[in-house]
């Protein structure tokens, strides 16, 4: 009986609670009111945020107001790589340079460019290169250059970085140069002739290497000859001249030798040396030691030394006058007593034989004829008078030239007489 009474009481209380909830709709379950509807909850939180009150968890972990943690070095590197890849994704479609076909140009030019493609592919498979321009180095793809290239006019040159010393160049563009750009091959735009010549030399070198591997003796000899010729071209040439040279030998032999050397150089300013020496063996032999055995007394020795010094001084003056005629500059090193060297550099064009007076007269008459034909407004009588006056002037100029030549001959004869007198004195003293 007691259990029934207890159950009845509990059941009656539950019914009262349910009836009270259905009767009063304003009074709601607080758990359901707070967590039942999410949309209402969000509205409540936003309203409370405006007043300053609200959910403390929402305010604490709000992503909008929260500051991010600092990035690590690895994250920074990844971000930089992504930024570098973004512009490459939006670039135009890059063509393989091996698929480009040239309508212009000869077969040799096409073969030369194909060889450059293969060499660039060995260095960089992506065909990324550095182009040499007036403003500096420019990084680009090889196909960009080939699309604008006209093979009938221009060509390409691949420059070896091992032989050339590259210097840092400042470009006007805003792009920054990375360390990886140093590994890219250098290419320069040149003329087609230069490209074909370089390609032919490249093929010749390959053939020579193949023959050397096979063991041919002819190729080795030809290479030795080429090396010797290159060494001769690179080295400065020398002319030996003894102090004891005669006047005739100087005029005939040494003058022709100096003129030939200047003509072979083409008058391009390539310097050469003239060494004035006692002998090939004893180049620096002083004058004091030459006449010790020949002279008996000191007075005779001093006289011979004075005569030798005068001879040497005359020889130096003759050489200087010859160099001035050939339009050359020179610097002197050394001393008359031992050895002297003339470092000579030709200034102008190579020396040539002077043309005859008859050819000059003919050229001048042709110029007069052309000038007279251009001036058609004048009368014939005035033209004839002008011609006669010009002929008179030419005859006077020729007479003056002949007088100058005669004076130069007399001066040379006097110099030769002096030199012959010195030679005679020198020989007389030696015989005594």
Swiss-Prot record:
InterPro entries found in the cross-reference section: AIM23
Residue ranges with Basic residues bias: 389-406
Subcellular location, record wording: Mitochondrion
GO CC annotations on file: mitochondrion
Superkingdom of the organism of origin: Eukaryota
Principal localisation: mitochondrion
Biased composition annotated in UniProt, kind: Low complexity: 36-50, 75-91, 407-416
Keywords noted in UniProt: Mitochondrion, Transit peptide
Annotated spans, Disordered: 36-91, 368-432
Transit peptide, residues from-to: 1-18
UniProt cross-references to Pfam families, sorted A to Z: mIF3
Protein family (similarity comment): Belongs to the AIM23 family.
Protein name as annotated: Altered inheritance of mitochondria protein 23, mitochondrial
Species name: Candida albicans (strain WO-1)
Lineage: Eukaryota, Fungi, Dikarya, Ascomycota, Saccharomycotina
């Amino acid at each position: 009986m007691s259990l029934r009474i207890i159950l009845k009481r509990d059941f009656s209380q539950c019914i009262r609670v349910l009836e009270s909830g259905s009767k009063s709709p304003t009074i709601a379950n607080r758990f359901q009111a707070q967590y039942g509807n999410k949309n209402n909850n969000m509205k409540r939180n936003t309203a409370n945020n405006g007043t300053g009150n609200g959910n403390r968890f929402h305010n604490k972990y709000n992503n909008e107001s929260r500051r991010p943690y600092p990035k690590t070095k690895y994250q920074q590197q990844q971000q930089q790589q992504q930024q570098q890849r973004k512009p490459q994704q939006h670039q135009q479609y890059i063509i393989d340079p091996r698929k480009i076909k040239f309508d212009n140009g000869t077969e040799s030019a096409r073969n030369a460019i194909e060889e450059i493609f293969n060499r660039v592919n060995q260095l960089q498979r992506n065909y990324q290169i550095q182009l040499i321009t007036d403003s500096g180095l420019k990084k680009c793809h090889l196909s960009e250059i080939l699309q604008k290239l006209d093979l009938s006019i221009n060509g390409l040159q691949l420059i070896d970085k091992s032989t050339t010393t590259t210097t840092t160049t400042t470009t006007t563009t805003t792009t920054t140069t990375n360390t990886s750009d140093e590994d890219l091959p250098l290419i320069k735009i040149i003329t087609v002739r230069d490209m074909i010549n370089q390609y032919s030399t490249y093929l010749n070198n390959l053939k020579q290497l193949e023959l050397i591997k096979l063991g041919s003796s002819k190729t080795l000899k030809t290479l030795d000859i080429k090396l010797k010729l290159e060494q001769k071209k690179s080295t400065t040439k020398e002319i030996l001249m003894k102090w004891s040279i005669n006047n005739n030998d100087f005029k005939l032999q040494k003058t022709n030798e100096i003129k030939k050397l200047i003509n072979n150089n083409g008058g391009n300013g390539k310097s050469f040396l003239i060494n004035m020496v006692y002998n090939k063996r004893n180049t620096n032999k002083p004058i004091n030691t030459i006449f010790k055995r020949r002279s008996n007394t000191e007075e005779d020795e001093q006289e011979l030394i004075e005569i030798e010094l005068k001879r040497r001084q005359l020889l130096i003056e003759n050489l200087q006058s010859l160099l001035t005629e050939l339009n050359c500059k020179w610097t002197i090193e050394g001393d008359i007593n031992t050895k002297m060297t003339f470092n000579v550099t030709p200034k102008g064009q190579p020396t040539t034989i002077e043309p005859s007076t008859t050819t000059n007269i003919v050229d001048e008459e042709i110029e007069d004829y052309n000038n007279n034909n251009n001036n058609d407004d004048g009368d014939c009588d005035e033209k004839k008078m002008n011609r006669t006056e010009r002929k008179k002037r030419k005859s006077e100029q020729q007479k003056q030239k002949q007088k100058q030549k005669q004076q130069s001959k007399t001066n040379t004869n006097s110099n030769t007489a002096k030199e012959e007198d010195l030679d005679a004195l020198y020989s007389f003293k030696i015989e005594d």
